[in-house]
Amino acid sequence: MLIPDVMLIPDVMLVTFVILRAKPEESYTTEKETIMRLGTSSPLTHNTPQEWAENQVKLGCRAVVFPVQSNEPKEKIDAYKKAAEEHDLLIAEVGIWRNALASDLDERTRIRDYCVAQLKLADYIGARCAVNVAGAFGPRWDGPYRENFTKEARTETVKMVQDIIDRAEVTNTYFTLEPMPWMVPTGPEDYIRLIEEVNRDRFAVHMDIINMTNSADRYFNAEEFVDKCAGLLGKRIRSCHIKDVHLKQEYTIQLEECAPGCGEFPLKHYVRKMHEIDPDMPIILEHLNTDEEYIKYMEYIKTHIVN
């Protein structure tokens, strides 16, 4: 029920991966595909925890984003945790995706509490990390504002991370911030500086190389930029996102996020470097709109990037 015939990518040559049209009860992966901890940010359409896990495995995933929130029943959390364990699905991350620096103090308090609860959830289920963005000093929760780069913003970001980690008191996971083009941290050096400022052993790195590709230099020297990120951040990286970036021809510089294979980023080099850092490093496909798109581009990753 997961991969319809019409979702094959045109002109894909299948040399190593030969099970695209499997029956629903069969696996869609080969032994070689299962080496890397690929995953998606989508839970895919499902009715039970068991079906969720089975669908992920059939797609070729060995890592998942946990699909249950901290405010849901413990029985549901436990059922998904068990399903992941039974299918050797590494829980890569627990998402937060809220503005923990919101200007409204009541809203900020509610979001901070949610951050703590999500981090505790990550600790309970054994996820590699809980992940958020630093936050924005404007109406859009993840928006681009000059105020994001003030001294006050950095001070508040450091205090926010410390507060969340100190309150959660986790021992089995890490709190991470996804780097962004227009908020702290914007690059590997900035991330190292932030780690030093936060000074908490449960603060680590979430890698999104495309979010940090925010200049012509990083775009045109992408392999060197990947190497720099790997060298500076290395073992601190807990989970990675994968997508692509396209440079549009119109003035002025316009870097557009897109699906893997629709841009020019050296994704093979990126994936190889992350895998060298940790053979269990989760590589998570994100920002697609439908199950069909996740199926399509996961097959692209398996045949063109991992192969």
Task: Give residue spans per PLM region.
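N-terminal pre-domain/capping segments
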Residues: 2, 8, 28-128, 162, ...
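Intrinsically disordered, low-complexity proline-rich tandem-repeat tracts
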Residues: 2-4, 8-10, 14-16, 20
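A cross-taxon signal for low-complexity, glycine/charged-rich
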Residues: 13, 25-27
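Acidic-and-aromatic substrate-binding clefts and catalytic sites of carbohydrate-active enzymes
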Residues: 42-50, 66-78, 99-109, 138, ...
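Short beta-strand segments at enzyme active-site cores
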Residues: 66, 92-94, 128-135, 173-178, ...
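Active-site acidic/histidine proton-transfer and metal-coordination neighborhood
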Residues: 85-86, 105-205
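Acidic/histidine-rich catalytic cores of soluble enzymes
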Residues: 94, 162-259, 264
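Short, electropositive alpha-helical surface patch
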Residues: 147-154, 184-199, 256-270, 293-307
